[in-house]
Design a protein with these regions (language model features):
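N-terminal pre-catalytic "stem/leader" segment of glycosyltransferase-like enzymes
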Residues: 2-135, 139
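Donor nucleotide-activated moiety binding/catalytic core segment of transferases
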Residues: 125-139, 293, 298-342
């Protein structure tokens, strides 16, 4: 990627050397002008590209050897737990709820590694910290696909627990996507070394077992820790008060949360086709008491600006606010293939599924169930249909309860307790 970014500079450099402003290396002087120029640019490009590959290979080698060193000369500490997340740079989400309980347990040594650095991006200090933590922890907890953990062979004494960030089982992932674009190859080590994966219901066990290439017995229906707040009236009231204090003009209005997922296969290429959701048109067509919260997926960086004339009706909280907290003030959700639908179903929030690219998404990504049959809300394919559904309160709300029943075994606010018990049981 770096070499591609540098390509325009290499081209300019080549032009300067063609005009003798800067001397052309002798090796290129026997060619015709065009061949000389192209050969020089390609040479510069390949040198940088090769250097990046060599650096990545070297760091991966150091990463593995560093882990081997700590594994050889350090013991596993039976009280040590390490949380690793590539999704967040603070203690939030499921980690926050689990940590809040664990910190009250005497004698635990709890560590966090919170950043999105790949092995190639890691400093040598970060490599040491990561590998030492993995080599000496009794339990390692993840909340996302973490490729670094699959480059090393964890000791049998170390238990790897995946608190998968999403509720339910919606979009296919992992080995379920073998035949799909960018799907995992059958030979990959990814995911297979999880000792336990926590899910929201018994129905999800088969999906996660298939997706991660692990035995069904390794998938445990504990519930999802961050959903416990939905059963905490005091927390709900606090979240509402906080939101209205920050956005007082939204109080008493009909709040619509626009929370789509990203398009693209990986974080680096993630996007949302903003031209398909024209904020100005939506505001024009719906009454003034409708206000909007825009909450794009964390992977999406290029989002549309808010029209000046509607700044009092639209706020973009893509980089702020915990998504769960926003649900406490939401009257209607506009989404597509986001796993947000699971949390929304717990709160019985009306939903509209704006899926203008459904067939393409099925071909490229697909679902664990028939989307048209099970989606817990109104399905629309155009902006006009979307506006009509909201205007007429046509949300197909009768589909919400069966959906929630399928994907949640527990609705008791005690999912965190069950996950904490699983972790502590593996410290013994």
């Amino acid at each position: 990627v770096f070499a591609i970014i540098m390509l325009p500079l290499f081209m300019i450099d080549g032009l300067l050397r063609m005009t003798d402003i800067i001397q052309m290396p002798a090796r290129f002087c026997d060619e015709s002008l065009l061949k000389r120029y192209l050969a020089y640019v390609f040479w510069r490009f390949s040198k940088v590209a090769t250097l990046k590959v060599a650096l990545w290979t070297a760091k991966r080698y150091i990463f593995k050897r560093c882990y081997g060193f700590y594994k050889l000369f350090n013991k596993v500490h039976n009280n040590r737990i390490t949380f690793i997340s590539l999704r967040r740079d603070d203690i939030s989400g499921n980690f926050a709820f689990v940590y809040d309980k664990l910190k009250n347990v005497d004698g635990l040594d709890i560590n966090f590694i919170l950043n999105d650095h790949t092995i190639a991006d890691m400093s040598f200090k970060e490599i040491r910290s990561f590998t030492k933590a993995c080599a000496t922890s009794k339990v390692v907890v993840l909340d996302e696909f973490t490729p670094q953990i699959h480059y090393i062979d964890l000791r049998p004494q170390t238990k790897l627990i995946q608190l998968w960030h999403a509720c339910g089982a919606f979009k296919t992932f992992g080995f379920t996507r073998l035949s799909k674009p960018k799907g995992s190859p059958q030979t990959t080590r990814n995911h297979r070394n999880y000792d336990y994966v926590t899910v929201s219901s018994t129905y999800c066990k088969k999906c996660h077992s298939e997706g991660f290439g692990i035995a069904t017995d390794n998938v445990v229906a504990t519930g999802i820790p961050r959903t416990d707040v939905f059963f905490d009236d005091a927390y709900k009231k606090q979240a509402q008060e906080k939101f209205y204090k920050e956005h007082p003009n939204f109080k008493g209005k009909k709040i619509v949360l626009f929370a789509p997922t990203f398009r693209g296969m990986v974080k680096e290429t993630a996007f949302y086709p903003t031209e398909m959701f024209d904020l100005e048109t939506v505001c024009q067509k719906l009454p003034e008491d409708y206000v909007f919260i825009v909450k794009h997926h964390p992977f999406v960086n290029d989002v549309q600006p808010i029209p000046k004339k509607y700044k009092d009706r639209i706020i973009d909280l893509s980089e702020d606010s915990e998504l769960n907290d926003l649900l406490f003030v939401t009257d209607v959700i506009i989404t597509d293939y986001s796993s947000l639908v699971f949390e929304a179903s717990l709160l019985d929030i009306p939903m509209v599924f704006y899926v203008f690219d459904l067939e393409k998404y099925i071909n490229e990504r697909d679902f664990y169930f028939d989307f048209k049959l099970y989606a817990p809300g109104k399905i629309v394919y155009s902006l006009e249909q979307l506006i009509s559904a909201i205007s007429t309160n046509d949300f197909c709300t009768e589909r919400i309860k069966p959906f929630a029943d399928m994907f949640f075994d527990y609705r008791d606010g005690k999912s965190t307790e069950r996950v904490v018990k699983l972790i502590c049981d593996n410290l013994k």
